[in-house]
Amino acid sequence: MRTIPPSELIINDDGSIFHLHLHPGQVAPTVILVGDPGRVAMVAEFFDSRECEVTNREFHTVTGTYRGKRMTVLSTGIGIGNIDISVTELDALVNVDFATRQEKSEKQRLTLVRLGTSGALQPDIRVGEFVFSRTSVGFDGLLNYYKGRNDVCDLAIEQAFMRHTGWNELLPKPYFIDADRTLFEPFRDTTRE
């Protein structure tokens, strides 16, 4: 197994990961990602119990239980760069042995749920209304650097979009990804299409 060098995995002197300041074991299998650190408290107030709370810069984390299920809520700050840092460090926390700096042979999958706010152009969507995104569109180009990018993207929509808009080839290639449909099931009776 490959040993991950300190230049690629920065571990603080206290054994926590560099940006999030979390230790292995402090991340639940389900992670709710919010942008604003102030929203962490709003979400965590619904927790039945809290086992840890860690803050470093814009990264504020609370891990606890909700209806008996262990969950983590984490603020990422603004922008895709911060989200990339957060998700990369979450993955390392559950899939890398910090003592040996080697990837664990058995990988743990995290369920990540992004919870945020957005403006709306449609007049029938009221302020404060609950909205699910069926598809995510990225213009930042970050996903283009990841292995398996084409396996998760809707390539036909991407090509149609670029043709329709006359997409400038000097810009990063946009990407379109459909949300996991199972996310909508619990809310089917309380939302509209």
Placement of each model-derived feature along the sequence:
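Short catalytic/ligand-gating loop segments at beta-alpha or beta-beta junctions
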Residues: E193
